């Protein structure tokens, strides 16, 4: 009976409305999320500019253009190092190079080519082709 009462509460116009009756996230929520992401990006860039010297910043910018994923990993490593107190003063270009090499070594996938030569039962080494 309770289910029937719930169905009777729907008006016939609700079917015609279709998807418009489903609550949609407001534009304010999207704007708020975008603003929050922008604020986080600004804070991250501010921290990185305090961590790196000019030459290292230029190198990181070049890396971000060429390989954005790797640049994000290096930025995350820099921020973690700064939060842990592992950095003393601004990191130089040489220090950033070393960090980039460590990140590359950790993420480098070993690629190998493997030849699988399977022999047919029809083709035997014992037979001679004449």
Swiss-Prot record:
Record Pfam families: dsDNA_bind
Keyword Coiled coil on entry: yes
GO MF annotations in UniProt: DNA binding
This protein's UniProt keywords: Coiled coil
Matches recorded under InterPro entries: PDCD5-like, PDCD5-like_sf
Name of the protein: Uncharacterized protein D2005.3
Span list, region Disordered: 1-46, 103-130
Positions in coiled-coil regions: 27-51
Residue ranges, compositional bias (Polar residues): 1-27, 36-46
SUPFAM superfamilies according to UniProt: Double-stranded DNA-binding domain
Gene Ontology cellular component terms for the protein in this record: cytosol; nucleus
Family that this chain belongs to: Belongs to the PDCD5 family.
PANTHER family per the UniProt record, alphabetical: PROGRAMMED CELL DEATH PROTEIN 5
């Amino acid at each position: 009976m309770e289910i029937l009462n719930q169905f009777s509460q729907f008006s016939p116009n609700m079917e015609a409305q279709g998807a418009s009756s489903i609550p949609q996230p407001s534009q304010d929520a999207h704007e708020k999320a975008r603003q929050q992401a922008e604020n986080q990006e600004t804070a991250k860039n501010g921290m990185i500019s305090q961590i790196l010297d000019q030459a290292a910043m230029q190198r990181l910018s070049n890396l971000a253009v060429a390989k954005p994923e790797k640049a994000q990993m290096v930025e995350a490593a820099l921020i973690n190092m700064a939060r842990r107190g592992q950095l003393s003063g601004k990191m130089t270009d040489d220090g950033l190079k070393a960090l980039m090499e460590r990140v590359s070594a950790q993420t480098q996938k070993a690629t190998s080519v493997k030849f699988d030569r399977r022999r047919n039962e029809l083709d035997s080494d014992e037979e001679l082709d004449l």
